[in-house]
């Protein structure tokens, strides 16, 4: 009986594998999706948001680590900016409780910032404060 059950299970597995080989390709993926997203064009929401930054730091969607490239802004001022959002414009940062020195620093680097609508994919949890990248 065990031998018969073993043979039947093997035959069922083999038949399933053979059926998978003869199925038309439309069963596996929608042709419209395959044509729409061919090659490296597949992107998710976070990738699109990052591409919209145009090389600038997005004040609504960037972590504090992105401010390291601006001397004097990381970590104190970067933390204030990240926690103070969301912003409608870059100049909204000036409404934060910043010292005169911090306001001067922000004015110095102002052209390096942009504002896009907040994305849940980039703002979930505390990833903007601690994105888990350690040296």
From Swiss-Prot:
Keywords: Electron transport, Membrane, Photosynthesis, Photosystem II, Signal, Thylakoid, Transport. InterPro entries: PSII_PsbU. It is found in: Cellular thylakoid membrane. It is a peripheral membrane protein. Residues 1-29 form the signal peptide. GO terms for biological process: photosynthesis; photosystem II stabilization. It comes from the Bacteria. Its main location: membrane. The keyword Iron does not apply. Pfam families: PsbU. GO terms for cellular component: extrinsic component of membrane; photosystem II oxygen evolving complex; plasma membrane-derived thylakoid membrane. Belongs to the PsbU family. PSII is composed of 1 copy each of membrane proteins PsbA, PsbB, PsbC, PsbD, PsbE, PsbF, PsbH, PsbI, PsbJ, PsbK, PsbL, PsbM, PsbT, PsbX, PsbY, PsbZ, Psb30/Ycf12, peripheral proteins PsbO, CyanoQ (PsbQ), PsbU, PsbV and a large number of cofactors. It forms dimeric complexes. One of the extrinsic, lumenal subunits of photosystem II (PSII). PSII is a light-driven water plastoquinone oxidoreductase, using light energy to abstract electrons from H(2)O, generating a proton gradient subsequently used for ATP formation. The extrinsic proteins stabilize the structure of photosystem II oxygen-evolving complex (OEC), the ion environment of oxygen evolution and protect the OEC against heat-induced inactivation. NCBIfam families: PRK02515.1. This is Photosystem II extrinsic protein U.
